[in-house]
């Protein structure tokens, strides 16, 4: 009985840890949040930097599939570099990253729509010639 209760407690704890780490990793996609962390000295704390290194397991497909903002993995990768962490103190750096993300999303959406339209046209042609 006690073992079952302990197991349930472990499962609940693991689930909570998973949710908290998922939420935190996704917050890393926000350049303004990264700037906030840098200005408050979190990136100078060796324990925090080690925690960021630990979080690299989110790059594994079994975990990455839960991410809503995949660009957070790129930011997590960049945060492994001290130079990048130091640059984030500068608000202009965060603003530049933010602008680059917006440009990427805009062009990605357009490219994706064009590719989808081309694929749909190709399928229509294949269906028409196959009949």
From Swiss-Prot:
This is Mediator of RNA polymerase II transcription subunit 31. One of its GO terms (molecular function) is transcription coregulator activity. InterPro entries: Med31_sf, Mediator_Med31. The keyword Nucleus applies. Its main location: nucleus. The modification N-acetylalanine is found at residue 2. Component of the Mediator complex, a coactivator involved in the regulated transcription of nearly all RNA polymerase II-dependent genes. Mediator functions as a bridge to convey information from gene-specific regulatory proteins to the basal RNA polymerase II transcription machinery. Mediator is recruited to promoters by direct interactions with regulatory proteins and serves as a scaffold for the assembly of a functional preinitiation complex with RNA polymerase II and the general transcription factors. Keywords: Acetylation, Activator, Nucleus, Transcription, Transcription regulation. It comes from Bos taurus. GO terms for cellular component: core mediator complex; mediator complex.
């Amino acid at each position: 009985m006690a073992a079952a209760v302990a197991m349930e407690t472990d499962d609940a704890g693991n689930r909570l840890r998973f949710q908290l780490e998922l939420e935190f990793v996704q917050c890393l996609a926000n350049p303004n949040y990264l700037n906030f962390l840098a200005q408050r000295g979190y990136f100078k704390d060796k324990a925090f930097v080690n925690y960021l290194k630990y979080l690299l397991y989110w790059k594994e497909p079994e975990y990455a599939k839960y991410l809503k903002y995949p660009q957070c993995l790129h930011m997590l990768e960049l945060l492994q570099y001290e130079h990048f962490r130091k640059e984030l103190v500068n608000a202009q750096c965060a603003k530049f990253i933010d602008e680059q993300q917006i440009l990427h999303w805009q062009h990605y959406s357009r490219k994706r729509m064009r590719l989808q339209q081309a694929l749909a046209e190709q399928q229509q042609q294949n269906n028409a010639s196959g009949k």
